[in-house]
Amino acid sequence: MNEFHQFEPYTLTSFDHAFPPAFYHFVALSFAIQKPQDAIPTLESAILRMVGELPFLTGEVGPCPDAKKNGVMRVQPSLNTTDKSSIVRVKEHPRFVLSSTPTPGKGTGTGQHHARCVDLSGAIVPEFDYSSISAPVFRAQINVLADGIVLCLAINHMVIDGTGTGALVDILATVCREGEGSVNYLRTCGAIQESTRRDLQDIGTQGQLPDGVQSSDDPTDGAGDIFEPGKSYANHTLVFSDAHVKALKGRCNAILAEMFPAASTGPPNPGTTVRDQRSLVSSNDVLTALLWMSISQVRSDPTQPREQSSVSVPVNTRTRFSPSLPDNYLGNAVLVTESKLALSELQCLNDDGHLGETSTQGIRLLSLLAHRVRSSIAAVDDESLRVSLRRAHHASDWETLLARPGDVVVSSLRSWNSFGLDFGPTLGGIAALELVPTFAIEGECIIKPCRCDSSGSGIWEVMVTLKPEHMHALRENQLMRCVLQCDYPVEVYRAG
């Protein structure tokens, strides 16, 4: 007999179809607890209460049998999800302890850290067939270590996007903290999911496509194989001080003010805190441009010359609709923007400057690339989003909606409030958060949730996935070394 509430199958939105049906986030939340066993009942009951009130989390992604288009997927009840062990499992790892993140102020420490780093990612993630379709929506594994708990969540990206994953962690914290008192809160969250999905579906059916706009039936040649797990990559976390990033942003904005004087002195835009969001750039834009430029430089191959490099930046569209979508909508509300760089533009990086210094040409190029990133993001507004949804609705094959990643992909989870969450008296707050790179994509960069280092100084942390030789070259890259504080391999826990 099924222990969970049943739900009616529902068709995934066109936003959801930007991702494959079996592509997962793996988020590892670490809790430092003196008696880890005491936390198991709290986590188990919270997870089961959450999926009980949000039953689509117990479901699976599969083909929509009555769809009039090709490639349409839906979330449906799963015959394999019948009891709590199919949703959340507990595993004991008594010989292992929580990872200790290197202190940025003491140099990279990469060699020492790497020497004790053990590849344990396969042991902590929930076990199921990641390549199967139908594909589970959500699974959890509670890993009990000698000095704490690592809760690993597997979340299907076709159902829940990055912002939604952060919201789901927030929901779980509330349920851990409030217990039975969270039921009404969960039911409100469930109602929000249903109403927002309907709203997005309705937008797609409203009105005709504007003249000259074609439906989304362009093929996505080879997009699927980019998302396949199992390839051997180096996954490092790069750490930058917030002060250095802000200083770099200031230099870029000064250059852009000279290049676009009319824009930088124009009337304030009420929708942004800067004068012109197309011309003045944020810290996030500058860091995105730095990663794009540096990775493009280290991956250039004279034997296989290419003319250009592209960067994909997924944009959270919740606040770009009018009216806005709810912050705690879990489903995909992402539009992937693209900017391009002619590789000939990188030639200026070899022309001047010394090791440890940023060249004039390098900063100028960085400013231009940050401006391109900002311009592509600024173009995402209510009107363009509604046209995008209508284009998708008119497409005859929804497999063509699958996003094709650029040469570099930079996603930002910095808005997550993970380190400010309270999971209740037993668990407390999160000691560490890692993104387990089981589904790593070469060239992917994920800006991690905002936090401070051990001294209380603000930092930016970015998980980067590259081939080992390119990762080494990136760490030695001239411009990167000017702002990189430290780096270390991704590690969730280690031998005690």
From Swiss-Prot:
Organism, as annotated: Aspergillus campestris (strain IBT 28561)
Keyword Iron-sulfur belongs to the record: no
Catalytic reaction equation(s): campesine A + acetyl-CoA = campesine C + CoA
InterPro entries, alphabetized: CAT-like_dom_sf (IPR023213), Sec_Metabolite_Acyltrans (IPR051283)
Function summary: O-acetyltransferase; part of the gene cluster that mediates the biosynthesis of campesine G, a dimeric indole piperazine alkaloid that shows good insecticidal activity Galleria mellonella. Within the pathway, cpsE acetylates N13 of campesine A to produce campesine C. CpsE produces an inseparable mixture of two acyl-atropisomers due to the spontaneous rotation of an acyl group at N13 of piperazine ring. The non-canonical non-ribosomal peptide synthetase cpsA catalyzes the first steps of the pathway by producing L-tryptophanal and L-valinal from their respective amino-acids.
UniProt-annotated stretches for the region Disordered: 203-228
Name this polypeptide is given: O-acetyltransferase cpsE
Disulphide connectivity of cysteines: none
Pathway: Alkaloid biosynthesis
Similarity remark: Belongs to the fumigaclavine B O-acetyltransferase family.
EC number(s) stated in the UniProt entry for this protein: 2.3.1.-
GO biological process: alkaloid metabolic process
Protein encoded by which gene: cpsE
Keyword terms: Acyltransferase, Alkaloid metabolism, Transferase
Database matches in Gene3D superfamilies: Chloramphenicol acetyltransferase-like domain (3.30.559.10)
Biotechnology and industry use: Campesine G features good insecticidal activity against the global honeybee pest Galleria mellonella, which supports its future application in the development of biopesticides.
Compositional bias of kind Polar residues: 203-217
